[in-house]
């Protein structure tokens, strides 16, 4: 990621700096902006929210969490989000502002579904809401060479 990659006159580096983001283990940059003070019976917060930014060439590596995750598009280029329930049957959606082109401003990834994302331009800023709250203890990052295996046809 570098200053040469711009969207609406702002580079990904500048957006990262202005929002106080830090590198995320799955790729991209993030900052937790909210963690609900209410907890469930196990003491886990009921929800959490982050900013998440992917720049040109950044990939949110294949991963899954044990909770529903809502992706909310905020700014920048559209985002390609690919989800896969069982390691075989995947679907891709584009998050963004161009509703006529089929983009949508949000998408829900069900609990335990595999997911990966990339920016379709210079950079993309999304928010991710997880309920119950995100916890790295309940986060699984796929091995670097893991890919879904289509049953009949290509991904």
Can you name each region flagged by the protein language model?
Residues 2-108, 116-117, 121-124, 128-155:
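Non-catalytic, conserved peripheral segments adjacent to functional cores
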